[in-house]
Amino acid sequence: MSYNSNPYNGGQYPPYNTYTRPNYSPNNGSQSNNTVHQYQPPRMPPPSTRPQTDGNSNQIPMENVGHISLSSANSHAYAPPSGPPPNTGANSYGNPNYSGPQLPNTQTQSYNLAGGGNFQYQYSTCQGKRKALLIGINYLNTQNELQGCINDVMSMSQLLIQRYGYKQEDMVIMTDTASNQRAIPTRQNMLDAMRWLVSDAQPNDALFFHYSGHGGQTKDLDGDEVDGYDETIYPLDHQYAGQIIDDEMHEIMVKPLPAGCRLTALFDSCHSGGALDLPFTYSTKGVLKEPNMLKESGMDVLHAGLSYASGDIMGAINNVKNIFTSATNGFNNNALQYSRQVKFSPADVISLSGCKDNQTSADTSVNGFATGALSYAFREVVTQNPQLSYLQLLRGIRQVLSNKYSQLPQLSCSHPLDMNLAMVL
């Protein structure tokens, strides 16, 4: 049964033209309609007074939200990383075929966690069924309107269909201009669609999740965050229904997956470094990154000063809070070990995010086409270089962005990842 025909909440929904959207105040008296516009960039981040839920329908304060808008960006030519790719093999990999970077060993892998504990996981061949959930929210006619998020998911759907063998009937696209009420990205619809994505998942399936929209942070309540903050994403009705926190997304989309099932996630939003709560993050050198709280605190001091100097008082306050959190946590490596114990998955889950947890992500325009910076860079790299390793993918994305943006895209995984493996979707 498809997502759009699945009566999650029972009953029939009214036709789209009788559906009343959340009561947002339009800018300058403008009226909403159901067509895709050339959108104007937001003038300010979402207000810090909007409600946030903790996953149990309890509202909690939210903090550190934002999404930077840039009016224009020049198209950057992608140059491959220096040095040759890893030795290639003769194996075929289904759809598409790879003859470059090495293919994964699909036998059960083991990982011994420092401090005790043995965990097992399995790479996916990605030769089973394919499903995709793509969510793009422009927050039409609000103070925080974005330009490129709807374009991002439409472009991503074409990339997945044309290059990676996904089918339209196995894909759900949610935007604020959708004609189907089930495809409006409200909080409940988004959670239902996430459950649809992972329903009946089997080993070697290939699932894809893409979110382009506002992101933020809020206080961590369960002790699994090194920096003391959960990452969040903003549904269209977040003012009334609340945000969606990383713990919820992990519980819904990662935890139910069997060993050997692939979920690839791409978060083009602010503060998205840990948006899926995956415990292993890798550098462009291909090595596992450990948190350096002293360095992070130093950067927060710098960011606090720059925010204050530029008039961003809330940004300065939030960076000072980050400094205090790092100090009071005693540079908390215990949180990292706890996270790896409780967030480890036998499935094959990989997440690309637009920036680090403490950074904002750009909403921009390339040659007059509104887009998110990460979504654009991802499309550029995989289109021009179809046979990539994960290391080459991460380096390529950073290279595309490096001359224009300060944000540092992140690659995280639910288990230790060989970064020289072929990138497959």
Swiss-Prot record:
Residues 1-110 are annotated as: Disordered. It is an enzyme of class 3 (hydrolase). InterPro entries: Caspase-like_dom_sf (IPR029030), Metacaspase (IPR050452), Pept_C14_caspase (IPR011600). Keywords: Apoptosis, Cytoplasm, Hydrolase, Nucleus, Protease, Thiol protease, Zymogen. It is found in: Cytoplasm; Nucleus. Pfam families: Peptidase_C14 (PF00656). GO terms for biological process: protein quality control for misfolded or incompletely synthesized proteins; proteolysis. Residues 29-38, 88-110 have a biased composition (Polar residues). Induction: Induced by stress-inducing agents such as H(2)O(2), sodium nitroprusside and cadmium chloride. GO terms for cellular component: cytoplasm; cytosol; nucleus. The active site is at H214, C270. Residues 13-28 have a biased composition (Low complexity). Its EC number is 3.4.22.-. Belongs to the peptidase C14B family. Involved in cell death (apoptosis). This is Metacaspase-1. It comes from Schizosaccharomyces pombe (strain 972 / ATCC 24843) (Fission yeast). The lineage of its organism: Eukaryota, Fungi, Dikarya, Ascomycota, Taphrinomycotina.
